[in-house]
């Protein structure tokens, strides 16, 4: 994490085990000197904490939220439903369905709940950070 700077990107993970994938997001943000923070918040186990974090993110100066989650992968959609910030979803690869469950849960959002969905796994985590960097650079 880049220290002593205003956080621009919030990385959320549904489970601590998702860190193995989301480290790819961190690498790209670090390389580009983008200040970020990481939180483990499950849409299923901690819905109130997810809502609280999401609702104050914009007031704190965060510009983009990146959400990595596996299986039912509701995190990105739930986050998007509580903010007007751009939300990027990263489907985490799973053992049972190789991440197809996560992909479909992340990409199939109802109208009015936009989530930019990346590829499954580490490639998606990397692309999420690259996409965030491009968004931030476009508005400098």
Question: Where is each model-derived feature located?
Answer:
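Basic/polar N-terminal segments that are highly enriched at the extreme N-terminus
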Residues: 1-6
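Glycine-rich phosphate-binding loop
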Residues: 53-92
């Amino acid at each position: 994490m880049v220290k002593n700077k205003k956080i621009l990107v919030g990385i959320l993970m549904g489970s601590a085990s998702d860190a193995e994938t989301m480290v790819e997001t961190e690498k790209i943000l670090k390389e580009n000197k983008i200040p970020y923070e990481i939180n483990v918040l499950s849409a299923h186990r901690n819905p109130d904490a997810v809502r609280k974090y999401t609702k104050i993110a914009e007031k704190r100066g965060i510009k983009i939220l990146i959400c990595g989650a596996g299986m039912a992968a509701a995190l990105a959609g739930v986050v998007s439903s509580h903010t007007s910030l751009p939300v990027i979803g990263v489907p985490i690869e799973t053992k049972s369905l190789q991440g197809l469950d996560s992909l479909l849960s992340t990409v199939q959002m109802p109208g009015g709940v936009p989530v930019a969905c990346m590829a499954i796994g580490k490639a998606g985590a990397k692309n999420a950070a690259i996409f965030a960097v491009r968004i931030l650079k476009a508005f400098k």
